[in-house]
């Protein structure tokens, strides 16, 4: 593949597609502001509306004056970036170079996604409204499923919407859930339609697995965390020294917890 035939938009789109496929936390966040970023330091203003007042209706009285919408202005800053930069030698056969480029770009997308996941997870850990720790209850006290019910109840008490609640668990917890008959997995799809990417459903949560977690269970709703990402640059170049084609790219992103009550972290202890 010659540098003259490299089409940045095509490879950037392919990179972005593979990037999104590799995300777990990134796929569960609100992505409403993704098209508004282009460079490091860009800011996006997010209006977090206050609750609308609901009043009792009396047909014999006039309606109260309409209230002006109010809320807080939250700033999302694009403050995280990662790049790749690799070479492909001229000596490779033409077809091999195309295959090598495709494989290299897929791997670059995966590595960028891993970097973004760690960044999002760090943001979630910092901004979560509730952080607790404790052992998984004994079997006669509900076991793991009992813990999920406790997390559900905690969110209910904070009036977190029940719609689209997500639960992200470590790999070890997935194994325990699969042995619980109250856990609805893919084989029971006729009973409950699973959200895309979810391994199952329990206690009102769509459940996902992340290899980046070891002893934490994270509950959240998408509106609680905003994530914006942009493959800002995908460039081909010809290094002066050697007979190579070079490809480099830059990924920029920003993440913010905008509704802390919508994020709950339980750290499992022995």
Where do the protein language model's features map onto the residues?
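Residues immediately flanking
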Residues: 49, 90, 171
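Alpha-helical scaffold segments that mediate packing/assembly in large oligomeric complexes
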Residues: 91-158, 265-270
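Extended, solvent-exposed, turn-rich assembly/linker loops in the middle of proteins
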Residues: 128-198
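Short Gly/aromatic-enriched secondary-structure transition segments
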Residues: 59-67
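Generic detector of well-ordered alpha-helical segments enriched in charged/polar residues
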Residues: 8, 12-16, 20, 121, ...
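Sequence/fold signature of self-assembling virion shell proteins
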Residues: 2-31, 35-55, 67, 72-78, ...
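Glycine-centered small-residue hotspots that permit tight backbone geometry or close packing
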Residues: 60-61, 159, 204, 209
